[in-house]
Amino acid sequence: MARKALIEKAKRTPKFKVRAYTRCVRCGRARSVYRFFGLCRICLRELAHKGQLPGVRKASW
């Protein structure tokens, strides 16, 4: 329940802009969230391995 409350709290518009922070839209994790996808590194990796993120490929150089 604590995570659910924090997710709802993050959705509200903060009194000051600097208080806004990103959360993973899938699991609610607050750390290491990629803004472009709105996902944390763990969810991003899982979805990329399944091929559910269009345009994402494994790097090779």
UniProtKB/Swiss-Prot annotation:
The free-text cofactor remark is: Binds 1 zinc ion per subunit.
For this UniProt record, give its keywords in alphabetical order, as a comma-separated list.
Metal-binding, Ribonucleoprotein, Ribosomal protein, RNA-binding, rRNA-binding, Zinc
Q: Which InterPro entries match?
A: Ribosomal_uS14, Ribosomal_uS14_bact, Ribosomal_uS14_CS, Ribosomal_uS14_sf
Instruction: Output the GO biological process annotations, alphabetical, semicolon-separated.
Output: translation
Provide the binding site for Zn(2+).
Answer: C24, C27, C40, C43
Q: Name one GO cellular component term.
A: small ribosomal subunit
Pfam families found in the cross-reference section? Ribosomal_S14
**Keyword Metal-binding among record annotations:** yes
Q: Which GO terms describe its molecular function?
A: rRNA binding; structural constituent of ribosome; zinc ion binding
The record describes the protein's role as: Required for the assembly of 30S particles and may also be responsible for determining the conformation of the 16S rRNA at the A site. Binds 16S rRNA in center of the 30S subunit head.
Assembly, in brief, is: Part of the 30S ribosomal subunit. Forms a tight complex with proteins S3 and S10, which cover it.
Among HAMAP family, the record links this protein to: Ribosomal_uS14_2_B (MF_01364_B)
The entry's protein name is Small ribosomal subunit protein uS14
